[in-house]
Amino acid sequence: MLVLRCRLGTSFPKLDNLVPKGKMKILLVFLGLLGNSVAMPMHMPRMPGFSSKSEEMMRYNQFNFMNGPHMAHLGPFFGNGLPQQFPQYQMPMWPQPPPNTWHPRKSSAPKRHNKTDQTQETQKPNQTQSKKPPQKRPLKQPSHNQPQPEEEAQPPQAFPPFGNGLFPYQQPPWQIPQRLPPPGYGRPPISNEEGGNPYFGYFGYHGFGGRPPYYSEEMFEQDFEKPKEEDPPKAESPGTEPTANSTVTETNSTQPNPKGSQGGNDTSPTGNSTPGLNTGNNPPAQNGIGPLPAVNASGQGGPGSQIPWRPSQPNIRENHPYPNIRNFPSGRQWYFTGTVMGHRQNRPFYRNQQVQRGPRWNFFAWERKQVARPGNPVYHKAYPPTSRGNYPNYAGNPANLRRKPQGPNKHPVGTTVAPLGPKPGPVVRNEKIQNPKEKPLGPKEQIIVPTKNPTSPWRNSQQYEVNKSNYKLPHSEGYMPVPNFNSVDQHENSYYPRGDSRKVPNSDGQTQSQNLPKGIVLGSRRMPYESETNQSELKHSSYQPAVYPEEIPSPAKEHFPAGRNTWDHQEISPPFKEDPGRQEEHLPHPSHGSRGSVFYPEYNPYDPRENSPYLRGNTWDERDDSPNTMGQKESPLYPINTPDQKEIVPYNEEDPVDPTGDEVFPGQNRWGEELSFKGGPTVRHYEGEQYTSNQPKEYLPYSLDNPSKPREDFYYSEFYPWSPDENFPSYNTASTMPPPIESRGYYVNNAAGPEESTLFPSRNSWDHRIQAQGQRERRPYFNRNIWDQATHLQKAPARPPDQKGNQPYYSNTPAGLQKNPIWHEGENLNYGMQITRMNSPEREHSSFPNFIPPSYPSGQKEAHLFHLSQRGSCCAGSSTGPKDNPLALQDYTPSYGLAPGENQDTSPLYTDGSHTKQTRDIISPTSILPGQRNSSEKRESQNPFRDDVSTLRRNTPCSIKNQLGQKEIMPFPEASSLQSKNTPCLKNDLGGDGNNILEQVFEDNQLNERTVDLTPEQLVIGTPDEGSNPEGIQSQVQENESERQQQRPSNILHLPCFGSKLAKHHSSTTGTPSSDGRQSPFDGDSITPTENPNTLVELATEEQFKSINVDPLDADEHSPFEFLQRGTNVQDQVQDCLLLQA
């Protein structure tokens, strides 16, 4: 037309000559202008090779836009790989490759037909025809993700001849709208084909202002009959398509209609439907193109079933986020989720942020769908109301925003989903591919959707996650983590359920639980929380204390199988972060909710926990003063706070990575480093809040990351359920432990502090890890940690679960190593055993506070009481269940029994709290090592303390060298031989000598260093071996070792039990003899012990050395220089640990 116009212009003189100037010229000019104006519609309507506008549109419609340029930046939104969009101007040619690239989205060449085919056989007959009709498009769009590739395939057939020149305007409008109306993109979701144009402007522009989906297609198809070569068949296709639209018409008609019914957006419905189809289908098959149709037809039972798809688009959407991430090629899903896309992008971003998140997100979203959907009845209802209820705004807004274009759809779909409950069932089937579960979930989701009607999208927790993610991101930075959590809704709400755990337990359970089959259990478990979730929608403060106490004592345990709840509470913690004030409450809630309540169930689940943590809070404040303290305190606090295993579990989840390389997880580093850095305030904010504040954003990744780890969490959760409750007595004890707060002054804090360190090791460990990250004045921090550990001592019993909580960190942190494997095993066993133990030793722990307050106001006494308690735990534990602890706690018993003389100092808490932790101390040998190290170091730092400890150890029930030497040695020798982990408690090789050596170790710094080394495995090695073996190892790791020995004497003492077992367990896995030279003597059992500490250090080094860092602080108060050495070496050790862990 432009050419015509130009011709007209150029030939105007001739025309004027030929025709009367006035009229003809005007006519021609008018015609030229008209043609020019029409030119674009003509271009748009049909490219030469395309039989129909639908076909044209199909070219670009992976993401409903051939014009990737505009959408190129949105490529991630619409599909993670939107390469197609970038070369979209080349789209005519591009669609074919992109379809392949976007295979899930568009299966390249056959896609067009396949889309039609996939959409339906009816569509398939119509495929050629359907190429033209927008209806078919809409139809396809319901199936768009699956059909889309087909669309792409055939349109490429049609359009490749056309070349790229036209498509930017023509094709993009056509194909883009046709491809998928990105509901999220400002264009009205009117036209599947046009409305779906990512260029809203384009489509409004191309489509002559967003004409109705069929109008655009029909108009163009009819307008441009020239391309309608195939249009006549396509004309049939409209008829057929309506038939397909009858069958799948519901997809077309219903899509628009259900869209209208759902959201009133045809495009949105199409987007919904198409993405939904893809979404639902995508869960079955991320590529899902083939599977998608299968799921579509299969899940929905056929073209007609796709109607359920459409209704189930919410569910599909639920899947959609998941498929989106999975099927990034399903850019359309992303696309149609234009809003969702943003959210989803955030979600994927979060997921991507947490690299595991994508997969895990898939895992979560999918698994949550899988598991959560199964658990949906419980989870989704509770979870959406909870998590989405927790984020009702987010839920509603995500529903509105993310599903805003779909909002009408999605919300109605949410509502419709309730109506669609049956359909969501099928859809869930498709979407979840867990039709049965999903179907129940469909109702649940219905319920959930009603409950969280605004969160109807929330009901689609995955979509909601997407929504949440994006939504919450918009909602608030603080909530951004929540968006992550929301986006990870199941993830992060999995975290969030930490805070909201019982409230978001659905999300959590769904997401986290989905990560693990436990999620289903969590579902049921969470169902209680759903009530809590709904009431928890009160939100964290009200809900969490109530929910958490309820949940934690019973649900916490129960919930811990919902380890995701465990880390979900972490996730909730980040959400708490979103609500800093609330968060603090919440975090305590989440923390105490899962563990805080467990810790201080009797205390205000979160208040006493907060109080207790704020006893710690004082410590914590000081810890806040020192980021490390903060970190450590935070660690305990958070573990205590996250005592809800949820908070901790996330660190479990995260620490594993952090353990892996001091990776500075958002969790660990963000706790420790971020905590350290912003931890002071943030930690002060609350450890949970720090999580919440610091982590939530970063936690978001953690949330997502944690979702990955929730499995660990699960282990821990499983273990945790008891641990929190059973540590809970310890925490009650911790409540009585305020004397330990006094103890802070005296180095009961060293003992308790070591206890704390032992308690902390997980926390201290990761805190050390954080410290190792070199953040804080290690020593001040350690002082804080020391007295903080004293504070933690007062919390120490409170902490044991915290240590468990920390231990998740520990487990995760040291190992990541045995993320949960060992500690979860150990935790399971150890929690069982340790709970038993906790019941007796930790009851001792409970008595321990009594010991401390009554008879041992002194740090030494307290420390010894800790030893006693821990010893009771270790030895008594050994006696109680040497086999149990050795075997059940094998890896942890060492930790637990690691310091009969000294480790038991820390072991009391460790035995129970830390021992549970030691259960995780397999990975958190450093937990014990640090604690033990702290204890030993502290003791070696202060001989009186050590002497007292030795005496107390001797006096301590199990600490009593008879018990220790015999009981512990007997059980532990076996365990030590078995696992060499028992050495600590049993001082396995130490035997009776161990007691003397313990004495010596505690009495003599020399022995403390040397005998500590020897104490673990071969105190028999005694000072000489310590001198020689450690020295030789020192030579290897002289810098680290000599300082580390100083650092490690206690550590070795602590490590022995753990170190031996862990050394064996981990040393064989990852021996780093040089790092832990002293642990070689320490692990007399196996020379690997040298590396065992490093293996432990690997696991525990980060934690251990961080605990050593704590020890430096602990010892700083005692022997600043020695601990300075240690502190310095701690760094080195931390480096070793980091090296090992890295």
Swiss-Prot record:
Glycans are attached at residues 114, 126, 245, 252, 265, 296, 467, 534, 934, 1040. Residues 103-114 have a biased composition (Basic residues). Expressed in tooth particularly in odontoblast, ameloblast and cementoblast. Keywords: Amelogenesis imperfecta, Biomineralization, Disease variant, Extracellular matrix, Glycoprotein, Phosphoprotein, Secreted, Signal. Involved in the mineralization and structural organization of enamel. Involved in the extension of enamel during the secretory stage of dental enamel formation. It comes from Homo sapiens (Human). It holds the Pfam family Enamelin. The keyword Secreted applies. This is Enamelin. The gene is ENAM. The modification Phosphoserine is found at residues 191, 216. Phosphorylated by FAM20C in vitro. Residues 117-128, 240-285, 452-470, 507-516, 531-544, 924-934, 1068-1078 have a biased composition (Polar residues).
